[in-house]
């Protein structure tokens, strides 16, 4: 029984088949193809959920999600769940200044809630605000990605004793602590950063002393989102100042990488992410032609 509608990968053998139409004015629509009808009409009596799998990077994605949900309802599906590993606007979880808005609370959540999904699954959300605002929210942690990364970083016995997890700031500490607890890693350090209040530019990054760390320690920075990557580059620089030969790895659930990989590739021995936002097949080399060790976990 086809119980998945995969908007990211239409060739998914488990997905029902559909057609997307796009009009000159930008409107999109979706049609469930005829040979799926009997399968879905049978769900009237046995309401097995149909799961819509999609990215939610922009309003075009949101439009297709709504169209897919309504198309499924049109052919009799009673229960629809939504799987969106990344949710647009996850960082805009509060009003940043007077005259502004809480984007998640006042824009995204009301639209998603209007669709009455039986469940909305999001992976490694930026904060608890998303969970508080979206009905029937289900949080997926980053364990699958971290396991994928750690197995590539060090797969030998007692690897957990050679890993130091790095929280990029105090806000990420609980998330990193949960990772440490899950994988039996004892060493965690938490960085702090000072920003220019007007520009948002990072003025200074500070980490605790690393002098007691053995030379075989690998530093693994864990966070939910990498946009331009400046936070992580500055953090890696500070670690390198004290430990010039340190091996540093970056594990981020949602990789935007808006500034590319030139600078990230200079400072990181490995970069690990999912394809929640986009599929990345070629990251090239760093600015000094250093090969970039980049690995992406497919979650669609």
Regions found by a protein language model. Name each.
Residues 1-300:
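PRPP-associated nucleotide enzymes
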């Amino acid at each position: 029984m086809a119980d998945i509608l995969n908007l990211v990968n239409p060739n998914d053998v488990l997905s029902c088949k559909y057609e997307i139409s796009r009009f000159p004015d930008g409107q999109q629509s979706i049609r469930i193809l005829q040979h799926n009808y009997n399968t879905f009409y049978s769900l009237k009596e046995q309401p097995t959920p149909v799961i819509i799998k999609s990215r939610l990077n922009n309003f075009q994605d949101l439009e297709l999600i709504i169209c897919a949900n309504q198309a499924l309802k049109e052919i009799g599906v009673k229960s629809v769940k939504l799987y969106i590993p990344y949710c647009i606007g996850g960082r805009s979880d509060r009003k940043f200044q007077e005259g502004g808005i809480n984007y998640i609370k006042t824009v995204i959540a009301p639209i998603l809630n209007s669709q009455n999904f039986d469940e909305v699954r999001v992976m490694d959300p930026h904060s608890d605000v998303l969970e508080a605002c979206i009905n029937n929210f289900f949080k997926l942690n980053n364990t699958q990605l971290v396991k994928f990364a750690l197995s590539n970083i060090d797969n030998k016995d007692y690897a957990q004793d050679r890993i130091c997890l790095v929280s990029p700031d105090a806000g990420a500490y609980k998330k990193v602590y949960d990772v440490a607890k899950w994988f039996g890693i004892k060493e965690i350090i938490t960085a702090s950063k000072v920003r220019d209040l007007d520009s948002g530019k990072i003025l200074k990054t500070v980490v605790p002393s690393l002098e007691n760390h053995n030379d075989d320690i690998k530093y693994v920075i864990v966070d939910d989102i990498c946009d331009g990557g400046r936070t992580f580059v500055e953090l890696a620089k500070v670690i390198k100042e004290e430990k010039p030969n340190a091996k540093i790895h970056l594990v981020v659930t949602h990789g935007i990488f808006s500034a590319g990989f030139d600078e990230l590739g200079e400072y990181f021995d490995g970069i690990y992410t999912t394809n929640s936002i986009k599929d990345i097949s070629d990251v090239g080399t760093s600015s000094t032609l250093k090969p970039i060790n980049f690995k992406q976990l497919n979650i669609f």
